[in-house]
């Protein structure tokens, strides 16, 4: 049955137990922190959706994510914590990690503490350690060493970019500020910039900071932002 967005499902094998599921959906320019029934903390970024049970039962704790979230998982060796996304299944006991799974973008699992196993759509499993990231995209699955702060600072109120392409930067800003971005030529998307920006600043403040590099300028009309490379 369904009532005001909460779906009730029976657990297979025990019809006497009814499990209530909640779905948390985050709009643009918003984020939300919640605590699950086992004490696990979850930070949800803009444009994300988390489906989770009101209480965990049985020998696993499973949630479903689309978008981006950061998890601080309570340790329970008898009940692994499982995050399912469109392209991966992440299994943990107790740890801190970030997951990004926006449509049309690379699927990222970034480990801050502990250890996790990431299973991709080909059922190949990758065990990673703190400071490592699993990347799933059209080329396949890879594991890289990363500076985790660049991928998790969003939960602390910042966008952090280190030699990121302007295309990736504008993708992330558009996810938060809900605008459409247009580039006057394809080469401008490959410009690399380093910046630390406050998430709750007005978008015009952030564009001014990026334009101070002297490489690009921005024009804005309604929800559309056009990026032009400055000729030297």
Regions from the PLM with identified roles:
Residues 1-232:
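A residue-level detector for the "anchor" residue at the start of short, highly conserved motifs
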């Amino acid at each position: 049955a369904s009532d005001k967005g909460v779906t009730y499902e029976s657990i297979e094998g025990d019809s006497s137990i009814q499990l209530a599921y909640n779905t948390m959906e985050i709009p643009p320019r918003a984020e939300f922190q919640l605590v699950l029934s086992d004490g696990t903390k979850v930070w949800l970024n803009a444009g994300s959706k988390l489906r989770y049970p009101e209480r965990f039962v049985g020998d696993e704790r499973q949630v479903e994510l689309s978008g981006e979230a950061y998890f601080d998982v309570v340790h329970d060796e008898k009940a692994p914590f499982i995050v399912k996304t469109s392209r991966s299944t992440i299994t943990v006991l107790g740890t801190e990690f970030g997951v990004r799974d926006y449509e049309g973008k690379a699927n990222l699992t970034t480990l801050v503490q502990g250890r996790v196993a990431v299973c991709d759509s080909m059922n190949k499993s990758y065990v990673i350690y703190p400071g490592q990231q699993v990347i799933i995209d059209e080329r396949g699955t890879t594991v890289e060493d990363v500076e985790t702060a660049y991928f998790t600072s969003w939960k602390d109120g910042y966008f952090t970019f280190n030699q990121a392409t302007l295309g990736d930067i504008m993708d992330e800003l558009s996810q938060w500020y809900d605008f459409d971005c247009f580039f006057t030529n394809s080469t401008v998307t490959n410009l690399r910039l380093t910046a630390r920006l406050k998430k709750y600043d007005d978008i015009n403040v952030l564009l001014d900071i990026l334009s101070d590099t002297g490489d690009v300028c921005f024009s804005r009309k309604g929800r559309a932002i056009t990026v032009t490379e400055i000729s030297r």
